[in-house]
């Protein structure tokens, strides 16, 4: 037997061990690590964890990516009543007033509110929501009985201080009456 064939035989167990180690290392890296919550959430929802995420497309166009941050795993039943945050990262430029107007339209789908509330909330959102560019983020924090606090690119923009506003605004994405049920399932973490 030549020395080269002897080395080949001796190397097989070593090779197998190396392949097993490599497979274990690669397998471990394929497990998705829990992403860190945005900095603005550290004081708002200190134990924030990513419950779910998705992407909104309209007529095939990528509009935004959205992530729902919760303190613990949340069921669909309690989605609108828990302090949590929705982070929207825009994939295209949009006008702030149009974002506010679309929000009101979607809130109407979720529940009822007066024309007085509509005018007040629309005015507040038009002040809070800037024109956005690709990569800009608007994060809404559901403060339940206090309303919703908004951050734009990590900086506090202001808040809508009305407990009735919070479940309607978050309901745009999390209510069973949402216009985007597939996106809701992705945010709740129940999508197949």
Where are these regions (language model features)?
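Terminal leader/tail segments of proteins
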Residues: 33-192
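N-terminal secretory signal peptides
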Residues: 1-13, 17-28
């Amino acid at each position: 037997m030549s020395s080269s064939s002897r080395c080949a035989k001796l190397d097989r167990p070593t090779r197998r061990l190396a392949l097993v180690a490599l497979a274990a290392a690669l397998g471990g890296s394929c497990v998705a690590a829990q992403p860190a919550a945005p900095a603005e959430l550290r004081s708002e929802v200190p134990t924030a964890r990513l419950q779910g995420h998705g992407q909104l497309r309209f007529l095939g166009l990528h509009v935004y990516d959205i992530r729902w941050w919760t303190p613990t795993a949340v069921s669909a039943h309690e989605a609108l009543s828990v302090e949590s945050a929705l982070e929207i990262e825009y994939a295209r430029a949009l006008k702030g007033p149009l974002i506010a107007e679309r929000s009101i339209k979607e809130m109407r789908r979720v529940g009822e509110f007066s024309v007085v509330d509509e005018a007040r909330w629309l005015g507040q959102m038009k002040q809070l929501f800037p024109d956005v560019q690709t990569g800009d983020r608007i994060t809404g924090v559901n403060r339940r009985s206090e309303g919703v606090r908004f951050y734009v690119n990590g900086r506090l923009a202001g808040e809508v201080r009305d407990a009735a506003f919070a479940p309607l605004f978050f309901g745009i994405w999390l209510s069973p009456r949402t216009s985007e049920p597939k996106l809701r399932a992705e945010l709740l973490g129940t999508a197949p």
